Every structure is written in structure tokens, then in C-alpha cells.
Amino acid sequence: MAKEILFSDNARNRLYSGVEKLADAVKVTMGPRGRNVLLQKSFGAPTITKDGVSVAREIELKDTLENMGAQLVKEVASKTNDEAGDGTTTATVLAHSIFKEGLRNVTAGANPISLKRGMDKACEAILAELKKSSKVVANKTEIEQVATISANSDSAIGKMIAEAMDKVGKDGVITVEEAKGISDELDVVEGMQFDRGYLSPYFVTNPEKMIAEFNNPFILLYDKKISSLKEMLPILESVNQSGRPLVIIAEDVDGEALATLVVNRLRGSLHIAAVKAPGFGDRRKAMLEDIAVLTGGTVISEEMGMKLETAEFSCLGTASKIVIDKDNTTIVDGNGDNERVVARVNQIKAEISNTTSDYDREKLQERLAKLSGGVAVIKVGAATETEMKEKKDRVDDALSATRAAVEEGIVIGGGAALIKASKKVNLDLTGDERIGADIVLRAISAPLKQIAINAGFDAGVVANEVEKSSNENLGFNAATGEYVDMFEAGIVDPAKVERVAMQNAVSVASLLLTTEATVSDIKEDKPAMPSMPDMGGMGMPGMM
């Protein structure tokens, strides 16, 4: 395929055209008075969203070169979303503003490489000031404020997320699902729950609820299949003498072993239940070890030189309660040693920070939550499927923003934090590096200006009012049109979101400015299909 090669200003201007188109579509969603964007899907009904990254992901431009520019800024939105969970619109607006200011200077003859150096230095200085001004999230109210702002000022969502985080802790897993009705619900599972139920319904102790419930049980953990009961007899006799129930968690229990356990359970001679171990392969071994740490037991494993028939009574774990239904097992208040639990939690945290796989990270975070607190499920309800998808997107955003706030603290919201931080920056630079730093310092007000525009106010007047104020916490409340103390008004942003958005925006804008040539495909128009030849003379002859 033939290629189109463009150089210097011609290349950068075409790239800028694509960046501008993407930014124009994304920035209308910004702020409490931002508008919705309607997205056509390849199948199903159109989606209505106010989520910047959802808009960016749908954009593909016809012009190849413009599309290259748009895709680079789309990457900014996606990366910001992956890293901080929110701030995609801020990152897009900043990248567009920095590229626009920089392009003007490059066209006027400034050296792009020197500009980039100055921009990087300004970015570092602003982020250092931002870090100084951040405030630790101290209570449930502040968590609620962050979640509410990120959910487009929906206080009901903010309250629900704060409630969920309060119950399962900052390391707990909070998942978002679609509800069956129109109202929102919050379900909290305390203790460790895994998705394996009883191996036989004959283990049920409460026929009305179809659950097996045991108080103060012993827990046997085995990493192999149990097919014969002979190897288990010593342990079973010891448990039977104690008069306490036993829950077996093994790779599988089948054949003679399962049949014998069921018969003894029905006779009432044993209070027992058997459950398959969660996970597969190495993950199963790790999860069995997690359960062992939580319950104070030991996984009986031949790899460790242990056999079921010689296992000691001390290998059994204990918990205050276990509830098993046909799909799930919940262990409440395991009696494990706190120091061992903390060490295990720290080990999993280290694995999370070292892994490069998103799937592994998700599974590790689930394990971490089960050890450290519990699992909360937010069920989002709405009248229509379109509304439910839009609402679910907002809840996901709010949840990610809240986690980011707990991690690195909060700063004043509404785009004011970056302006206040930039005012304190004093860099000793000269020439084009100075110009590069000034580009970033000027462009930093773009998010605040866009919030003001979307709310119907004069962007220049609002930005000037916030910038000249000596009150460190003063910002613009676009919902009411007032200048307020942002912390007091509860208008806050996670410091991590602002940091990641800023870093990614400067990174991609400086790369675009230092682009001197582009090579892209030339789309060739395919010739139209020729029309079918005339079929004259092929008809049936008339009847005589």
C-alpha cells in the first residue's frame, strides 16, 4: 500500500486537527454541568454517557493522519483511567491545551526538544507542589465527598460507596453489578467467601434455606483428592471425640469417601460437610494457604512431606462460624494468628505491585480483600438498560476515584488545585526551556475553564478570580456559580488522579510537539462493482 509522508508543520497541524476533534467530543462531559454524549454501538441500543474515557474509546477518524493524533490522546485517557480510575477528561483537556500552546511556539521557531525539557521541569515542579497541598482522607465523610464528585454530584452513589468502604476497609473488594430492580442495593459479605458450595445437598443443616451452618467448626485443608475414608480415620475419630463439627476443604471428595461421609451425616454420628477447594492449579494452592493462615490451620500437602493418614489434630483450622450454600462458602472470624495474617497480606501486596498481568492483579486483589476485610457488592438499579449502563459507569468511576483518594490523599477540586500549585512554581530557566515551562503553566487552567464553559460562565473571568485569590482553598463551584472554600464545600479530587492526568498529558503533548515526520497509509478508493450484464434474450419464448 502506498504511504503518505509529511514533514514538520504540515505533519503536526494534521495531528493537531485529530487531537482537537477528540478533545472537543470529550470535554463537553466535564464538570457538574457537563453534557451527555450519545454513542452508537455496533450492536444493541445507543449508549448515553458522561464518562470521558468511554467517549474517547469510541472515536475513530476517517483521515489516517488525524486518527493518529486522536489515538495518541485516546491513549492518554485510557492510561489515566487504568492507573487512577478517573481524570480521563482532565488528562485529555490538558493534553489538547498543552499541544495547542506548544504548536504555536514551534511554528514561530522554538526548538521542540528544548520546549519538552522545560515542560517536563514545569510538570515536576507542579506535582511537587500538588503533593504538599494534598490532605489525607481521614473519615467516612471525606470518602463520601470524593465519591459524590466523581459520580457527577450524585450523593446517593457517594453515600453507598462510603458505606461499602467503611464496612470492608480500604483493601476490601467492592464490586459493581446490575440490579434486577430499579433501586440500588449494597450487599456486604463479612469474612472470607469463595465460590464453591457443598459437594452434596445431604450436608444441609437448614433445609428451609438450603444451607449448611456450623458454629465453632474444625477445618481440614487438603490439596489432593480424597477417594477413600481410610486415610482420614485418625482425624475423624479425634474430631468426633471433641463433639465439634468438621468442614473438609479439598481438591475433591468423591466415591466411597463422599458416600461414607453422607451416610454418617444422615445417621447423625458426624456433623460434617465437604467442599471443593477454590481456584485451579497454583492459585488453588495459594488460596488454600490463605484459608490456613486465616483459620490457624495447616494445609496437608505431600509436597511438604505430610500425609492425610499421619496428619496431626493441630493441623486443623478453626473459625467461629462457617455457612455453606450450593454455590458459596463463607468463613466468619477465622481463629488465625494476627501476625501471620498481616505477613500474608503484605506478601500479597508485594505480589500485586510486581505483577504485570491485569488478570493476576485482579485475582490477587480478591485474595487480599478476603484476608483483610470482606467483599461488598453494589447493585445498580435503573428503569432502562441504557440508564443502567450510564449509572454503572459513574459508580465505577466514583469507586476508582475513592480508592485513589485513600491512596494519595485529596486536593481541592474543580480544576483549582493545579492552578494553585502552578502559582507557587518558580523555575530558573532561560530561552526555549523557559517558554516550554510557561506553556505548561498557561495550559494548566484549561480544566477549570472548561468546567466554567460547560456551566455557562465566562472561562477567563472564573480562572482569573481563582488565580488571583490569596485563599489557598478557594475555587469555583460550577453547580451553584459561587466562589467557595472547596474543602468546606466538599468539592475535592484525589491527588493521584490530578498527578496521573498531568503526567500523561505532558508526556503525550511533548511527544507530539517533537514529531518531525509522519508516515501513514494512503486510503485508495476501491472501484465500484460493475453492473450485471443485460439478460435480454434469456427469457422463456412466448407460447404459440
Curated annotation (Swiss-Prot):
Please list the GO biological process terms of this entry. protein refolding
Instruction: List the keywords (alphabetical).
Output: ATP-binding, Chaperone, Cytoplasm, Isomerase, Nucleotide-binding
Going by the record, the broad EC class of this enzyme is: isomerase
In terms of InterPro entries, this protein maps to: Chaperonin_Cpn60_CS, Cpn60/GroEL, Cpn60/GroEL/TCP-1, GroEL-like_apical_dom_sf, GROEL-like_equatorial_sf, TCP-1-like_intermed_sf
UniProt superkingdom = Bacteria
Q: Name one GO molecular function term.
A: isomerase activity
In which compartments does the protein localize?
Cytoplasm
EC code: 5.6.1.7
Annotated Gene3D superfamilies: GroEL, GroEL-like equatorial domain, TCP-1-like chaperonin intermediate domain
Q: Which Gene Ontology cellular component annotation is one that this UniProt entry carries? A: cytoplasm
- Keyword flag Coiled coil: no
The UniProt catalytic activity note for this protein reads: ATP + H2O + a folded polypeptide = ADP + phosphate + an unfolded polypeptide
Specify which residues bind ATP according to the UniProt entry for this protein: 29-32, 50, 86-90, 414, 477-479, 493
SUPFAM superfamilies given in the database record: GroEL apical domain-like (SSF52029), GroEL equatorial domain-like (SSF48592), GroEL-intermediate domain like (SSF54849)
Where is region (Disordered) located?
Answer: 525-544
Q: What does this protein do?
A: Together with its co-chaperonin GroES, plays an essential role in assisting protein folding. The GroEL-GroES system forms a nano-cage that allows encapsulation of the non-native substrate proteins and provides a physical environment optimized to promote and accelerate protein folding.
Subunit structure, briefly? Forms a cylinder of 14 subunits composed of two heptameric rings stacked back-to-back. Interacts with the co-chaperonin GroES.
Concerning NCBIfam families, the annotation shows:
GroEL, PRK00013.1, PRK12849.1, PRK12850.1, PRK12851.1
As for family, the record states:
Belongs to the chaperonin (HSP60) family.
Q: What is this protein's name?
A: Chaperonin GroEL
Its lineage reads: Bacteria, Pseudomonadati, Campylobacterota, Epsilonproteobacteria, Campylobacterales
Gene transcribed to yield this protein: groEL
